[in-house]
Amino acid sequence: MKISIYATLAAITLALPAAAQDGDAAKGEKEFNKCKACHMIQAPDGTDIIKGGKTGPNLYGVVGRKIASEEGFKYGEGILEVAEKNPDLTWTEADLIEYVTDPKPWLVKMTDDKGAKTKMTFKMGKNQADVVAFLAQNSPDAGGDGEAAAEGESN
């Protein structure tokens, strides 16, 4: 019985990165409406792909970007601790899915600090892979083409 439980847990853990790649970017763009209260997606040339808030960092290029590295953004203690302990760590689709599902447990896991705090209180209960697929599409370093920015789309 214990072996089947461990096998199931291992299968779920291994499937998480694949789930990130199965997201639908078009659906994710619609779901991003929940995120734009705090976040925007703005290309380096200033083109607004998604106009949004400035409470959270600009998410253009987030997939493949080093953790807590958006220039000029004032990050919270928990995410800064992740970056300090893992200076070469970049956002992967799998990490982003886990983070947007519930930031606090991800911070605790990455810092080994049960007291880790996050400024991001939003928890995404569904469609995380879709939103992350949309973010990847707007992350040239992750293999996304930044297509929306190149076309000068503005929302």
Curated annotation (Swiss-Prot):
Q: How is it modified after translation?
A: Binds 1 heme c group covalently per subunit.
Per the UniProt entry, the signal peptide is: 1-20
Q: Where does heme c bind?
A: 35, 38-39, 120
Q: Which UniProt keywords apply?
A: Electron transport, Heme, Iron, Metal-binding, Pyrrolidone carboxylic acid, Signal, Transport
The keyword Secreted is annotated on this UniProt entry: no
Give residues where Pyrrolidone carboxylic acid occurs: 21
Could you tell me which Gene3D superfamilies the record lists for this protein? Answer: Cytochrome c-like domain (1.10.760.10)
Q: Which domain of life is it from?
A: Bacteria
Presence of the UniProt keyword Metal-binding in the record: yes
Positions annotated as pro-peptide in this chain are 150-155
Molecular function via GO: electron transfer activity; heme binding; metal ion binding
Task: List the InterPro entries.
Answer: Cyt_c-like_dom, Cyt_c-like_dom_sf, Cyt_c_1A/1B
The protein's matches in PANTHER family, at most eight in alphabetical order, are given as:
CYTOCHROME C
The entry's protein name is Cytochrome c-550
